[in-house]
Amino acid sequence: MISDFAESCAYLMNNLERQDMRSVPIINAGAGSDEHPTQALLDMYTILRTFDFDQTADKQSSFVELQKTYSELTRGPANKTYLFCGDIGRGRTVRSLTTVLSQYENVRVVFVSPEHETLRLGDDLRRRLHQAGVAVYEFHSLDAELDGKPLLQQVDCFYMTRIQLEYGSSDEKGEIESMDLSPFHLTKQRVDLLKPYVPIMHPFPRDSVIQEIPPEIDSDPRVMYFRQARNGMWARAALLIHMFGAADDLFMLYDEFYGD
């Protein structure tokens, strides 16, 4: 009874057109297969830190050295090609993150998914990205080519998502489980095609059966999904501090305990 009442209150409050009419703030921490804004926050924090290149994944390559090989490389999320692989149609993290990325200039987004109507890019997200001026590409294998070269050699960020079998009917689940998903596995051979600075991301959890990213990849210095998980704590803590207007208090406490 309490659960039903709480859910009804949250629904009614979320549908108030004016935010100032809501008695308490509401955080969308993941809405089924629709959106996942807080994941997008931590993903963007990870991307911003990575493309600042002060703490690059390849610690033996400085930004200047990278530019000698990749002359068009710039700092920040702009001017980048982002690849999203896996369950694109139902991947809520994909929807939210690409929406944020669309705010940056000269962004290309590549979607790689099985040719199944529930897994491939939906018309709504495609339309949203096109309206934002984002160049969108769709492929059905990680071994595809872009600009006449292997696709994986052309991307600046790799974002994997698991196939979300919990959504859809039992018939759909059976169809997907019977598919050959090997073209969407990030194998060691495919990782070797990536540029040395490309962050490898995953929102977690991984599928231990399908193994879209096998554990053997975890030791690669470009892997960022463990850092993503850690960044989630900081991003969500920052969101709570912002919503409660506690930033000034936090800075005061920081100065008190850590200041000179």
Please report, for each region that a protein language model flagged, where it lies by residue:
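Phosphate/diphosphate ligand-binding glycine-rich loop within oxidoreductases
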Residues: 1-54, 207, 213
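Rossmann-like adenosine-cofactor binding region
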Residues: 130-216, 222
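Glycine-rich phosphate/diphosphate-binding loop of Rossmann-like nucleotide-binding domains
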Residues: 50-161
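Short, conserved loop/helix-junction motifs that constitute active-site signature segments
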Residues: 20, 76-77, 102-106, 189-197, ...
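Adenosine-phosphate binding glycine-rich loop
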Residues: 194-260
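General beta-strand structural signal in soluble alpha/beta enzymes
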Residues: 25-29, 36, 84, 201, ...
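Short, charged/polar "capping" segments at the starts of alpha-helices
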Residues: 2-8, 92, 116-122, 208-209
